[in-house]
Amino acid sequence: MSSGGLLLLLGLLTLWEVLTPVSSKDRPDFCELPADTGPCRVRFPSFYYNPDEKKCLEFIYGGCEGNANNFITKEECESTCAA
């Protein structure tokens, strides 16, 4: 296969990976955790994956502790957890 063909194949595989949604079997376990604001009192708008609604929702993160189901952007949440 020519180098141009390999580059095309690599590009198509990369595009497929980006556009393929996360399936529940590939979803990290922490995506099932509830939103956890933590004990601190700073107010950071954040996002968490809600497995019941099957989407990322906004919540206020207190700035410390909490859990791994906590994302700065909705896009990051969706690419990690959303199906």
UniProtKB/Swiss-Prot annotation:
GO terms, biological process: venom-mediated blood coagulation
UniProt protein name: Kunitz-type serine protease inhibitor textilinin-1
Organism: Pseudonaja textilis textilis (Eastern brown snake)
Domain BPTI/Kunitz inhibitor: 31-81
Chief localization: secreted
Endpoints of the signal sequence: 1-24
Lineage per the UniProt record: Eukaryota, Metazoa, Chordata, Craniata, Vertebrata
Family per similarity comment: Belongs to the venom Kunitz-type family.
Additional remarks: Negative results: has no effect on tissue plasminogen inhibitor (tPA/PLAT), urokinase, activated protein C (APC), elastase, factor Xa, alpha-factor XIIa, thrombin, and factor VIIa.
Cellular component per GO, a single term: extracellular space
Entry-linked SUPFAM superfamilies: BPTI-like
Positions of transmembrane segments: none
Cystine residue pairs: 31-81, 40-64, 56-77
Places the protein is found: Secreted
Database matches in Gene3D superfamilies: Pancreatic trypsin inhibitor Kunitz domain
